[in-house]
Structures are given as C-alpha cells and as structure tokens.
Amino acid sequence: DVFKPGDHGSTFGGSCLAIAACAATLSALVRGDYAEHAAKVGAYMEQALAKLPHVEEVRGRGLMLGCDLDDAAGDAHDVVARALGAGAVINATGAHTLRFLPPLVCEEVDVDGLIEILSDVLA
C-alpha cells in the first residue's frame, strides 16, 4: 500500500520506446552526411524559389530558407493557407515573408512538388 492510484507514473515521463527512438535517430544523424545533403538540396530549392512569380528575395542556409514576396502576391498568410489547401505545409513570418523548414531527408523531387504548388498559388 505504498502507492495509491495516480501516485506513480506519468504520461510525460521517459519510456524505453522513446529512448530507443532517440538513440536510433542520433545514430542515423552521426552516420549520415546531412549537412552536405542539406546544402545541396537547399541550393536547388533556393534557385527554384527565386524563379517563382512575385518572389523578390530568397535567403537562408541549407534547407532553412525564407523568401520575400512583392505586394502583388498579397498577404503571406493567405499564401500559406492556399498552399496548405494544395498540400504544402509552409509558414509565414510576416506579411510578405514565407519560411521553409523541410526535413533533412528532403530530396529534389520533394522540392519540385513544393515549387509546383507555389507556382500555382502565386500565379
């Protein structure tokens, strides 16, 4: 009778499954060359974003990118909503700024899909 119901355990405490998932993730990060991959795919994405209509500037590093839209594009939050409706999850950090943070395993084909959606949304 040391513990009463609710005294021991939690939904937020560490678990063996969470530790195993974390260890596997860290192991994959150590083995992989994600920095080089992010630089390569990020450069591809930066060039593709710069060619879109209404994009004034693209900046960032690797796969962490942002772009500024001209006034004709409308509010960036509306662009985000339309992109989400078409299947792309992006973020607006201001009235004219979009932010992109794709996963490190993102490939050029994934960038192509995003660019296709944004091309339609910004047309």
What spans do the regions from the language model cover?
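Conserved N-terminal phosphate-binding loop of PLP-dependent enzymes in the Aspartate aminotransferase
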Residues: 1-123
